[in-house]
């Protein structure tokens, strides 16, 4: 089942996934909750959308600061995942940029392709917005647009739309100053320029040159419109990782943004136990397996020895930045916002489950078991673990059933539960806060008997597929929890993930069995 409660009323992108966890559709939204919810309301859909909804088994989302950023991020995610349901719906062209060429008298133009020469700004999602910005900058700074310098002044010069470098009406130095200001505006650094223009406007008004003052006023208004920054796609030639976290109840909730050449391409989230040097330990483990970026943006500084370690792994200097203001600080804050919304929206699910099941503590670690087989062959068990309300795939486990002949889900559940928790006890690892069994009262009873033999005292429930009924040991009737309630939806989400994982393993074993063996 799809639990929509975790979605915020904020702009961002959503990623629909199928039974195998593959991204099949990427969309953007001004309001994530409203947009995603609209798919699952009971109403008629066109055949393509109906097919999409039928295939959806889960989703992820990334919050952005603005709808414009959501547009840009959507474009990036589509090109990364190439989702099945986006291919025929999205234009494969890049959004157009504004280009200042690299010439003695640079010209301003629109371009969909970023070449090596000159400066590029954007891209812009809306053609209307892009054209508006282009015209404002071109007109304000009277920049040339002609491909070749004409030998005589054109109409644009005569209507004061161009400064006329072709006829020597402006020096190269003065023209370069105009280009510099235009670039500053296109980068979003326009506050000082606006203040200067406001001063000029007041002087014009004091001299009763009201027409010129009003024209300047309109240009200032146009420039102010440009101040909305596009954090998701910046002009960087190097890669950045942006990391932020929250520590709560001795647990670290961490978000990692991956920025590739100025474009936010991915987010990764982690939940683990708090320790005195948790950040150092995380960075060492993560970057021992993943190449460090050119720049690492963090909420706190690192020891010099750790920076040296990262540089050694990369083979070149890694820059560590702790921004206090500006665009990088905004991205760091955006990562934190995603931690708060992504993880602590999930906390509400945990609290609902704790309340409905009368659990002694918040079920921060939940393990769920499922059995999958095909006509009694390739019978496998799966176990998924949710930590902090989210899948912790590092702790997923697969079990090839060894002691059961034919179809016997009860005996199969007993085997995987016995193997899992006897191993945890032997290795002296922590037990989960809740165990879920995919099945009815029979599977629940089998699991309960094995746990009792092992003297494992962990809350145990099962969920039956058809009516999504939840059972606990010792009570014949299902718990009075409606399948549409938050607690039930969360259990269904976990069960569906265990089922998906089991089916994936089952398919893998069947494929291997079909490969001829060499004599």
UniProtKB/Swiss-Prot annotation:
Taxonomic superkingdom: Archaea
Claim: Cell membrane is one of the keywords in the record: no
The UniProt record lists the keyword Transmembrane helix: no
GIY-YIG domain location: 9-87
UniProt keyword list: Cytoplasm, DNA damage, DNA excision, DNA repair, Excision nuclease, SOS response
Gene Ontology molecular function terms on file: DNA binding; excinuclease ABC activity
Subcellular location: Cytoplasm
Any Gene Ontology biological process: SOS response
Annotated GO CC locations: cytoplasm; excinuclease repair complex
Domain UVR: 191-226
Pfam families to which the protein is assigned, alphabetical: GIY-YIG, UVR, UvrC_RNaseH, UvrC_RNaseH_dom
Function: The UvrABC repair system catalyzes the recognition and processing of DNA lesions. UvrC both incises the 5' and 3' sides of the lesion. The N-terminal half is responsible for the 3' incision and the C-terminal half is responsible for the 5' incision.
Oligomeric form and interacting partners: Interacts with UvrB in an incision complex.
Similarity field: Belongs to the UvrC family.
Protein name: UvrABC system protein C
Organism of this sequence: Methanosarcina barkeri (strain Fusaro / DSM 804)
């Amino acid at each position: 089942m799809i639990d929509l409660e975790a979605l915020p009323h904020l702009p961002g992108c959503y990623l629909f996934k199928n039974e195998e966890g593959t991204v099949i559709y990427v969309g953007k939204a001004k309001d994530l909750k409203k947009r995603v919810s609209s798919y699952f309301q009971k109403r008629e859909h066109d055949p393509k959308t109906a097919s999409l909804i039928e295939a959806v088994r889960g989703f992820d989302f990334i919050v952005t600061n603005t709808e414009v950023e959501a547009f840009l991020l959507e474009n990036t995610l589509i090109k990364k995942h190439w989702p099945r349901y986006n291919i025929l719906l999205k234009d494969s062209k890049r959004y157009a940029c504004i280009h200042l060429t690299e010439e003695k008298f640079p010209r301003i133009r629109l371009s969909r392709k970023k070449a090596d020469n000159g400066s590029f700004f954007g891209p812009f999602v809306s053609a209307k917005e892009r054209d508006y910005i282009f015209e404002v900058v071109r007109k304000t700074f009277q920049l040339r647009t002609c491909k070749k310098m004409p030998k005589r002044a054109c109409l644009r010069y005569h209507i004061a739309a161009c400064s006329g470098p072709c006829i020597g009406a402006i020096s190269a130095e003065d023209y370069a100053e105009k280009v510099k200001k235009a670039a500053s505006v296109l980068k979003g650094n326009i506050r000082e320029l606006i203040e200067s223009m406001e001063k000029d406007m007041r002087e014009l008004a004091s001299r009763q040159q009201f027409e010129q003052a009003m024209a300047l006023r309109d240009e200032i208004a146009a420039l102010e419109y440009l101040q909305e920054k596009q954090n998701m796609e910046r002009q960087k030639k190097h890669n950045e990782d942006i990391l932020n976290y929250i520590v709560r109840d001795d647990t670290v909730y961490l978000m990692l943004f991956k920025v590739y050449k100025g474009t936010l391409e991915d987010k990764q989230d982690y939940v683990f136990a708090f320790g005195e040097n948790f950040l150092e330990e995380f960075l060492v483990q993560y970057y021992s397996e993943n190449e460090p970026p050119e720049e690492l943006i963090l909420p706190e500084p690192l020891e010099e020895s750790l920076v040296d370690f990262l540089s050694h792994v990369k083979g070149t200097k890694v820059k560590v930045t702790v921004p206090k203001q500006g665009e990088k600080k905004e991205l760091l804050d955006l990562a934190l916002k995603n931690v708060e919304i992504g993880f602590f929206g999930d906390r509400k699910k945990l609290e609902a489950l704790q309340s409905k099941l009368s659990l002694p503590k918040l079920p921060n670690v939940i393990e769920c078991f499922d059995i999958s087989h095909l006509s009694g062959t390739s019978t496998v068990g799966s176990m998924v673990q949710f930590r902090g309300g989210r899948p912790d795939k590092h702790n997923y486990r697969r079990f090839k059933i060894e002691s059961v002949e034919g179809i016997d889900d009860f005996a199969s559940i007993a085997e995987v539960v016995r193997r899992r928790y006897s191993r945890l006890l032997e290795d002296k690892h922590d037990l989960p806060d809740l165990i879920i069994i995919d099945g009815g009262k029979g599977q629940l009873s089998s699991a309960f008997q094995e746990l009792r033999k092992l003297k494992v005292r962990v809350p145990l429930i099962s969920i039956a597929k058809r009516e999504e009924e939840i059972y606990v040991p010792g009570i014949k009737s299902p718990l009075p929890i409606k399948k549409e309630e938050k607690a039930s939806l969360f259990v269904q989400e976990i069960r569906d993930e265990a089922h998906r994982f089991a089916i994936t393993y089952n398919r893998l074993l069947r494929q291997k069995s079909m490969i001829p063996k060499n004599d």
